[in-house]
């Protein structure tokens, strides 16, 4: 990025149709309430198809049977995905029992899907159950407001830090930031909770009448763990502690991973450091970053609308100065911090007050009763006896948190009995995929259904070369939107077409470097052939402690992405 040649603060031109839709929606109401009563279709029509996203839902259909239904002259089997707002991924065991029952009784697939944004999703909610799901969430103190579309999404927070005391403080800030940046419209309460319409006019002092130009993602991260992948986010607060006490945050802005195949105006980007701020300025700074992006973000081209592009267009110093002006502060220099890893610590970890945390590996976050491994039933039984909380991690795993010593063996026995503590290889622990087929409308290639068998094959390659007990951060995402965060992996696969992927290499273990495309549009056998050769070289030629991604860069196999706006596509 060149500070010498900044672009315009505001992009002039014809606004995208999404801007019209938001402006005409009457603060996100549209005609959703009327549409709910239309029994002629299982989906939402017109603008409502997009407006429901502001209410935490996506309209999907089962793509496995789409063609078959079309032949039968039937509309696609529409069903909604609903994503809960759950700052920091913390959910009580009482809440868990209620959502478990809803998934079993009222969804097509009967599963709960943990996401890498520390929340859970229901897939396969029929239109008749859409209002009941919101009312169920409300009954246990939860909601789905602002978990999709052009708002500040679910706020992440490091799940299982080495400093347990810091978690409670950081988590409280994640909740405060989430609440502060929520939309103020009463549309959600009116439509889903049957709350009375109030005569006063809606106002959106932070988000504005047309909300943000694009999705906006926020994290609170506690070093040395980068489990939440801060560089995938628009705004990250890095916790800085003195003597075990939180004193403030380093602010990083402008990360983001989504691209469009072949569109060189799009690129993945790591976040930029702005500076340190004391705790008392946190909410003002969060608001200032969001409102600057609200006012300066590109509303003419949604492919170029995220904060990372705004930052590149206007220049880092210009954006930073505007945030300082709006927040009424001057950033202090960045305080020292370091990341050493981003995987979850599977198994028992002792926390403060003699309590224990049990991190359970949930492959791809899909909670279901599998043959011989009834995971969903096991978690329900643990929820019944555990008085504490569960924490959903950004690696799609689940922590049974704050277990007293007296309960530890009971919880462990249940986890063992239900297959929740089966041995897992380091490679499988460090592999992740997005949902993709059959429910995601954007999917170009398999991801969640592809990953388990693909990991088996990668493990065989690693064992062949004598590195079977080690790991490489592996991510698969079904399309270039990048929900699987492949653009921060050492090996990243990005779906291009059924059975075909772009292979990216050169990220690192701590998630601070964007990988570059190594081969384009290749099949699984071709991917494995490349990995066989490269993992073999890594095993023989690496330096002590050198990760696979760092090796591919040092050995000249791949050039590092140093300035994504300029060299991502080179």
UniProtKB/Swiss-Prot annotation:
The keyword NADP applies. Its cofactor is siroheme; [4Fe-4S] cluster. GO terms for biological process: cysteine biosynthetic process; hydrogen sulfide biosynthetic process; sulfate assimilation. [4Fe-4S] cluster binds at residues 434, 440, 479, 483. Binds 1 siroheme per subunit. InterPro entries: CysI, NiRdtase/SiRdtase_haem-b_fer, Nit/Sulf_reduc_fer-like_dom_sf, NO2/SO3_Rdtase_4Fe4S_dom, NO2/SO3_Rdtase_4Fe4S_prot, NO2/SO3_Rdtase_4Fe4S_sf, NO2/SO3_Rdtase_FeS/sirohaem_BS. The keyword Metal-binding applies. Pathway: Sulfur metabolism; hydrogen sulfide biosynthesis; hydrogen sulfide from sulfite (NADPH route): step 1/1. SUPFAM superfamilies: Nitrite and sulphite reductase 4Fe-4S domain-like, Nitrite/Sulfite reductase N-terminal domain-like. One of its GO terms (cellular component) is sulfite reductase complex (NADPH). GO terms for molecular function: 4 iron, 4 sulfur cluster binding; heme binding; metal ion binding; NADP binding; sulfite reductase (ferredoxin) activity; sulfite reductase (NADPH) activity. It catalyses: hydrogen sulfide + 3 NADP(+) + 3 H2O = sulfite + 3 NADPH + 4 H(+). Keywords: 4Fe-4S, Amino-acid biosynthesis, Cysteine biosynthesis, Heme, Iron, Iron-sulfur, Metal-binding, NADP, Oxidoreductase. PROSITE patterns: NIR_SIR. It holds the Pfam family NIR_SIR_ferr. Gene3D superfamilies: Sulfite Reductase Hemoprotein, domain 1. Its EC number is 1.8.1.2. Belongs to the nitrite and sulfite reductase 4Fe-4S domain family. Alpha(8)-beta(8). The alpha component is a flavoprotein, the beta component is a hemoprotein. Component of the sulfite reductase complex that catalyzes the 6-electron reduction of sulfite to sulfide. This is one of several activities required for the biosynthesis of L-cysteine from sulfate. This is Sulfite reductase [NADPH] hemoprotein beta-component. It comes from Salmonella arizonae (strain ATCC BAA-731 / CDC346-86 / RSK2980). The gene is cysI.
């Amino acid at each position: 990025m060149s500070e010498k040649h900044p672009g315009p603060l505001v992009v002039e031109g014809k606004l995208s149709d999404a801007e019209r839709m938001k402006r005409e929606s009457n603060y996100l109401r549209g005609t959703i309430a009327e549409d709910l009563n239309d029994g002629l279709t299982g989906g939402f029509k017109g603008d409502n198809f997009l407006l429901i996203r502001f209410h935490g839902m996506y309209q999907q259909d089962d793509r496995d049977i789409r063609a078959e239904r079309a032949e039968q002259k039937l509309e696609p089997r529409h069903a909604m995905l609903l994503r809960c707002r759950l700052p920091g991924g913390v959910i009580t065991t009482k809440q868990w029992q209620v959502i478990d029952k809803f998934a079993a009784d009222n969804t097509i697939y009967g599963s709960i899907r943990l996401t890498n944004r520390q929340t859970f999703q229901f897939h396969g909610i029929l239109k008749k159950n859409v209002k009941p799901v919101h009312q169920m969430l409300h009954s246990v103190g939860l909601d789905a407001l602002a978990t999709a579309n052009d708002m500040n999404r679910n706020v992440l927070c490091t799940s299982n830090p080495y400093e347990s005391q810091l978690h409670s403080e950081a988590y409280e800030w994640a909740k405060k930031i989430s609440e502060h940046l929520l939309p103020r419209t009463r549309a959600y309460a009116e439509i889903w909770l049957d709350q009375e319409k109030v005569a006063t006019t809606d106002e959106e002092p932070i988000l504005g009448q047309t909300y943000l130009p694009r999705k906006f993602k926020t994290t609170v991260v506690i070093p040395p763990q980068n489990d939440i992948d801060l560089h995938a986010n628009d705004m990250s607060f890095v916790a800085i502690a003195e003597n075990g006490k939180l004193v403030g945050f380093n602010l990083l802005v402008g990360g983001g991973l989504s691209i469009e195949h072949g569109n060189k105006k799009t690129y993945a980007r790591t976040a930029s450091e702005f500076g340190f701020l004391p705790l008392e300025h946190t909410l003002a700074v969060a608001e200032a970053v969001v409102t600057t992006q609200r006012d300066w973000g590109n509303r003419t081209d949604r492919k170029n609308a995220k904060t990372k592009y705004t930052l590149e267009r206007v220049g880092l110093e210009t954006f930073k100065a505007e945030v300082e002006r709006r927040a009424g502060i001057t950033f202090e220099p960045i305080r020292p911090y370091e990341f050493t890893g981003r995987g979850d610590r599977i198994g028992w970890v002792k926390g403060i007050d003699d309590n224990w945390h049990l991190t359970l590996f949930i492959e791809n976050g899909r909670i279901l009763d599998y043959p011989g491994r009834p995971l969903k039933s096991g978690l329900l039984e643990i929820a019944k006896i555990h008085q504490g909380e569960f924490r959903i991690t950004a690696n799609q795993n689940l922590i049974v948190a704050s277990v007293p010593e007296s309960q530890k063996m009971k919880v462990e026995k249940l986890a063992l009995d239900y297959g929740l503590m089966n041995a897992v290889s380091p490679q499988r622990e460090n592999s992740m995929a997005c949902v993709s087929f059959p429910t995601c409308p954007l999917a170009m290639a398999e991801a969640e259904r592809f990953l388990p068998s693909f990991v088996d094959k990668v493990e065989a390659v690693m064992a062949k070369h004598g590195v079977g007990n080690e790991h490489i951060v592996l991510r698969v995402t079904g399309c270039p939107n990048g929900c699987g965060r492949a653009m921060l992996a050492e090996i990243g696969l990005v779906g291009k077409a059924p059975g075909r992927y772009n292979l990216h290499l050169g990220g690192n273990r701590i998630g601070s470097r964007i990988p570059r495309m190594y081969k384009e549009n290749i099949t699984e056998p071709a991917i494995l052939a490349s990995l066989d050769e490269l993992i073999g070289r890594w095993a023989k030629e690496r330096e002590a402690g050198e990760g696979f991604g760092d090796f591919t860069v040092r050995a000249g196999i791949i050039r590092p992405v140093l300035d994504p706006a300029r060299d991502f596509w080179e």
